[in-house]
């Protein structure tokens, strides 16, 4: 007979009782998939790697940025950490990027005249944007893909973009907190093999637009989850605030919650009224005080009035879509 992974979990628990052994105190207690009552599709365990690494750092070290696929109980295949345009999209101009030896100590050392200008409206205003993402971003203006991050995972970097557009216009951003353990939302970090990373996105634009609580942010992939009853949904928010963020050496059976991204989410006419407002995080929350890609140009980030934003859980939410209308 065929034993499912859920039956295997139950049998292993019985075996522990029979032999008198007990699981390690570091082993998280994994709930049953039937405990989940929300709108997400649930997967469990490690994904199958379909792309081993999207990026090699030419100068220094970088975390492996793989892409995987995992199938839920209904047979739907999910891409983790998210579908992306890193390999094919237009790359943003490097503000600070160690792998390309672009390491200016201040904005005065940056040749901003070399930044290419993406055209949304030929007769529009030319706007410059300064972006720092932990880890990865894809920027759309009125549905047009303007630029993608030049580093999917690490080392931390920052970028400049330029585009011509007429007001009003819509900024839409896909942000991804990358993962080493594909499908499990975690990485080998802080002495644990399965430790959840954190995200964060901040940007300012030359027309005065800055990231803040008036932006919208919706979650589309949350992991690692060990107790599915910790997930909830209230007023459009996909919440995981009651879920543990502690690292472990035994996280291979963690769950993940997935929501389908709308095909036209980046378009100006997309209706995002049901999406919650973005959550704001401090520089200490994101941990950028030792990141030169941020600190060397802080006048264009928090110094310009911008705030770090994400969804309601900057640790467990790994794929987030952001939107903002500039009037």
Question: Could you say what each language-model-derived stretch is?
Answer:
Residues 22-24:
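Bacterial signal peptide processing site
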Residues 27-137, 156-327:
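Beta-strand-rich recognition domains
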């Amino acid at each position: 007979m065929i034993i499912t992974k859920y039956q295997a979990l139950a049998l292993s628990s019985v075996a522990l009782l029979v032999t008198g052994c007990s699981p390690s105190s570091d082993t998280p207690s994994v709930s049953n998939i039937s405990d989940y009552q929300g709108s997400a599709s649930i997967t469990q365990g490690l994904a199958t790697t379909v792309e081993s690494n999207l990026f090699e750092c030419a100068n220094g070290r970088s975390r492996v940025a793989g892409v995987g696929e995992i199938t839920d109980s209904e047979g739907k295949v999910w891409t983790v950490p998210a579908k992306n345009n890193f390999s094919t999209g237009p790359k943003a101009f490097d503000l600070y990027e160690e792998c390309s030896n672009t390491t200016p100590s201040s904005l005065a050392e940056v040749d901003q005249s070399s930044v290419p200008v993406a055209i949304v409206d030929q007769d529009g205003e030319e706007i410059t944007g300064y972006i720092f993402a932990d880890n990865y971003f894809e920027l759309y203006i009125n549905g047009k893909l303007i630029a993608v991050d030049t580093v999917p995972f690490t080392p931390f970097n920052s970028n400049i973009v330029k585009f011509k557009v007429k007001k009003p216009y819509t900024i839409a951003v896909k942000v991804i907190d990358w993962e080493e353990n594909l499908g499990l939302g975690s990485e080998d970090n802080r002495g644990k093999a399965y430790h959840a990373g954190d995200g964060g996105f901040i940007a300012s634009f030359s027309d005065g637009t800055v990231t803040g609580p008036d932006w919208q942010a919706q979650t589309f992939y949350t992991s690692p989850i060990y107790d599915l009853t910790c997930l909830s949904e209230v007023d459009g928010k996909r919440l995981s605030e009651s879920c543990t963020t502690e690292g472990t050496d035994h996280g291979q059976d963690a769950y993940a919650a997935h929501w389908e991204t709308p095909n036209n989410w980046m378009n100006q006419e997309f209706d995002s009224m049901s999406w919650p407002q973005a959550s704001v995080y401090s520089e200490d929350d994101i941990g950028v005080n030792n990141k030169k890609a941020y600190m060397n140009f802080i006048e264009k980030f928090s110094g310009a009035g911008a705030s770090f934003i994400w969804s309601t859980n900057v640790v467990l939410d790994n794929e987030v879509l952001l939107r903002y209308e500039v009037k």
